[in-house]
Amino acid sequence: MIENNEFDVADLRREYTRGGLRRNDLTTNPLELFEHWLKQACDARLADPTAMCVATVDENGQPYQRIVLLKHFDDKGLVFYTNLGSRKAQQLANNPHISLLFPWHMLDRQVIFLGKAERLSTFEVMKYFASRPKDSQIGAWVSQQSSRISARGVLESKFLELKQKFQQGEVPLPSFWGGFRVNFDSVEFWQGGANRLHDRFLYQRDGNDWKIDRLAP
């Protein structure tokens, strides 16, 4: 228990000076602006620019978050892959509502997608799984994600065992490994601004079009 914490986080602050976001900077389709920002994040050599915070909820309404890598995006949605026995996959099976947050701190930016997740087809999953490095494929077999284990050595021993087993030939797709596509209907773009007057624009699906509103910071 920390009673007298000398590490005071209340005074940790900085100014956001990397520019603003104006309506004439926006695109008609939010995915076009997202792609532009993502490319800028890559050009800025941010660590893991495709990393997103994935939020789901359990049957009691308790939210959970974790970092997952985006693997594809287009007008159909945003795609990520995971162990189907994982907490997030189980929660999405019960409640498909999901939030994705891209935290590009070094650029004073963030993007939030809201929508529903749907399972990818076996063909889509197999196609991506085949493109992964072999060690990553084996890693998918090793971990029963979110289950309790006694020590890291359990994972390492299993990895070496399976690496020997799959030394020759291809690594098959685990039946418990798959992916999700997030069909989004809301996207918010946030750009840090001076004096905490941040710029926020919310895209909301309106039939085949997108309604755009500026939000107060």
From Swiss-Prot:
GO terms for molecular function: FMN binding; pyridoxamine phosphate oxidase activity. It catalyses: pyridoxamine 5'-phosphate + O2 + H2O = pyridoxal 5'-phosphate + H2O2 + NH4(+); pyridoxine 5'-phosphate + O2 = pyridoxal 5'-phosphate + H2O2. Pathway: Cofactor metabolism; pyridoxal 5'-phosphate salvage; pyridoxal 5'-phosphate from pyridoxamine 5'-phosphate: step 1/1; Cofactor metabolism; pyridoxal 5'-phosphate salvage; pyridoxal 5'-phosphate from pyridoxine 5'-phosphate: step 1/1. SUPFAM superfamilies: FMN-binding split barrel (SSF50475). Its cofactor is FMN. GO terms for biological process: pyridoxine biosynthetic process. InterPro entries: Pyridox_Oxase, Pyridox_Oxase_CS, Pyridox_Oxase_N, Pyridoxamine_oxidase_dimer_C, Split_barrel_FMN-bd. Its EC number is 1.4.3.5. Belongs to the pyridoxamine 5'-phosphate oxidase family. Homodimer. This is Pyridoxine/pyridoxamine 5'-phosphate oxidase. It comes from Serratia proteamaculans (strain 568). The lineage of its organism: Bacteria, Pseudomonadati, Pseudomonadota, Gammaproteobacteria, Enterobacterales.
